[in-house]
């Protein structure tokens, strides 16, 4: 049976779902309907999203939210509060100050950065599981789930497809890959996933890995950036300084069972020294990593050759 695919522009990127199934057209339509529902829930750049209602009510009142949104904020908050974590879901005011990745991107002024840094504090996010409410204690705070939403959404689509009996699929959310089973359209071989060469245009790979029932998530400074007066500013920010994080890395890829875990650990670890990243990954069950530094050197965690 051939591979059936459908692509749409959602969540600020091109999303493609490919699967092998007699009901492909119907399943693809339902998968994208689910993604549109999740985008409405999690979008930090839409005035109409459920997430934005929380941000509008910052410093005013708690907001009751859908269980999916509560779950994702809870997960994001847990990892934002973890020691030495570079993940911070309260980073919204800083993202909106720089706007890197948007048409109105600019280099933020020091005064602007200093004015929003006090708002980037995940300790000011208060959750009440008994009422499913979220409250931002300081006016001007903004939650941004951009570092987690694609992974969480990919997992939701995979869960739906598995419940429908799909045994061969590839979900590609703008380079965040999640696979179900093997590629039945190509002799039931593992899916072959390329690891992007950060120094070259998309589609140029430094290596290819075989993947079965795994997620492959890459975060890199090459993805979205702004160049002003010869200086390059990427989109991965340091919550402490308000500026793009200083790093030796060009990209960090995490291979995991769940896509949201790939999002969590690429974000938590980006900004650490490569040796520290590999040391931490070795202690995480079910997590592997591929690091590419700015010189193009590649290093991998111990489980990569056995994938």
Regions found by a protein language model. Give the residues of each.
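Mature catalytic core of soluble alpha/beta enzymes
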Residues: 1-307
């Amino acid at each position: 049976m051939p591979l059936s695919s459908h692509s749409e522009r959602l969540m600020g990127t091109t999303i493609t779902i490919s699967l092998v199934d007699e009901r492909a057209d119907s399943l693809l339509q339902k998968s994208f309907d689910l993604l549109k529902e999740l985008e409405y829930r999690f979008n930090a750049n839409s005035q109409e999203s459920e997430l934005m209602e929380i941000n509008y009510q910052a410093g005013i009142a708690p907001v009751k939210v859908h269980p999916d949104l509560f779950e994702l904020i809870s997960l994001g908050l847990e990892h934002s509060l973890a020691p030495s974590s570079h993940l911070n879901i309260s980073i919204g005011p800083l993202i909106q100050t720089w706007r890197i990745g948007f048409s109105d991107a600019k280099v933020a002024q020091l005064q602007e950065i200093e004015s929003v840094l006090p708002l980037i504090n995940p300790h000011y996010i208060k959750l009440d599981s008994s009422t499913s409410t979220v409250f931002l204690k300081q006016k001007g705070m903004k939650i941004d789930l951009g570092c987690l939403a694609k992974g969480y959404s990919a997992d939701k689509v995979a869960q739906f497809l598995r419940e429908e009996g799909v045994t061969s699929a590839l979900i590609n959310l703008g380079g965040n890959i999640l696979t179900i089973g093997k590629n039945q359209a190509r002799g039931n071989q593992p899916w072959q996933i390329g690891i992007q060469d950060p120094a070259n245009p998309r589609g140029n790979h430094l290596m290819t890995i075989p993947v079965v029932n795994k997620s492959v998530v890459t975060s890199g400074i090459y993805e979205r950036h702004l160049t002003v007066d010869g200086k390059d500013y990427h989109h991965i920010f340091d919550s402490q300084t308000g500026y793009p994080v200083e790093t030796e890395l060009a990209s960090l890829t995490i291979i995991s069972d769940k896509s949201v875990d790939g999002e969590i650990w690429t974000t938590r670890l980006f900004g650490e020294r490569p040796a520290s990243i590999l040391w931490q990954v070795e202690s995480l069950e079910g997590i592997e990593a591929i690091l590419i530094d700015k010189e193009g050197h590649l290093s991998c965690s111990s489980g990569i050759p056995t994938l």
